[in-house]
Each structure stands twice: as structure tokens, then as C-alpha cells.
């Protein structure tokens, strides 16, 4: 178990790191070529706005208002009240809510984006709420993902990330963390398969350029937000 000081440091690092990643990556989101960052953006005005973080604050608000046993249906009610993003899976889920469909139907019905990254990118909250307890982190991640990714690879991506991030409070070896996290997603999922293949290529010692080409060959998708290619 980590002590309170370590816990605070890791949670703070998680939130700051998420802001850094979004601020650097946000301006080039959707570009498909290999990117080499040599200069950092001007952050004198603070980090860029980031829906990855905004939605986690909505979920945190749901927990504060409704208690820790919050369900997918209750999370979808929070979305209906506080979320107004029109794009991709968010927009389809919100349209379904306006039809009267709560989660998980809000995330499943007529939604072509269930396999995308909208839910994996908001997994950190469940890890920091349940550090060292991946089972509970995954359970909440699944409830969250059902709001806009029910039945899709996006749900498995959020579950994988929540497990890995929760265990990272006590484990520091990246390969070990990835292998352990894979136990929390279906073996026949594309997310799980893509990550296992990528581990194999990494351990064979080939270049990252080759690994990238293999990922795109086996799991590539014209939609840049498709989860398996991004997570791998």
C-alpha cells in the first residue's frame, strides 16, 4: 500500500500529466503521420480546455451528489444535465438521452462510435478513486463507458486503462502492468488482441516504426479515434 504522501503525489501527477498530454496533443489531434515534438506550446495561459478532463469532473460531480454506488443510468442523467458536446459518440449518446434512452441504451442504440476513444480517455478518475483496487476501478469504468460506448471496444479500452492505472499506484514495471491489465478485458476483444500483439513485437526487439506499421496493418482504421489502434 502507498502512504498518504505518495498517494497525493501520484494523484497530482496523474492530473498534471493528463493536462500536459492534452495541451501538447490537442492541437495535432487527428493527424495520422509520425510526429516528432521538438517545441512545447506556450502554456502561459494555463493548459488547453480538454473534454477528457471535463467529463471526469462531471462524473466526480455525480459521485458527490449521488454517492459512491453511482450507476450507468445515473451517470447518463448527469450527462443529460451537464454535457453539451455534439461530436461523435458524445453527440449520439446525448441524442439517445433526448429520446428517453438512459445508459446503457444511450451508448448502444444507433451509435457508430462505440469502438472509439471517448471513454478510454476518461479512465483516470476511477483509478485515483480506487488505487490498488483494479476490480472496483474496472467496475466503475464499465458503468461510465456504457453511457456512450455500450458493447463496444471503447468500453474495453476504458476498463483496460482503469485497471492498469489503479495497479500503477503499487506497481512500477510497465510491461507487468500491461499484462496484468489485459486480464480485465475479453480475450477476443480487438483492444486486448492489439495490445498483446504489440507487446510481442516490442519484446522481439524490432523498431517502433515497424511496430507502428504492424499495428496499422492489423488494427488500423480510417477513423483516427478507433480504440484498438490508439491503445496499442
Residue ranges with predicted function:
Residues 31, 36, 40, 44, ...:
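Solvent-exposed, non-transmembrane amphipathic alpha-helical segments
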Residues 16, 47-50, 55-56, 60-151, ...:
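Active-site cavity-forming subdomains of large catalytic enzyme subunits
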Residues 1-58, 75:
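An N-terminal structural lobe/cap that precedes and organizes the functional/catalytic core
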Residues 15-26, 115-122, 226-230:
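Conserved phosphate/anionic-ligand binding catalytic regions in large, soluble enzymes, centered on
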Residues 2, 7, 11, 97, ...:
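Accessory "access/gating" subregions that flank catalytic or transport cores
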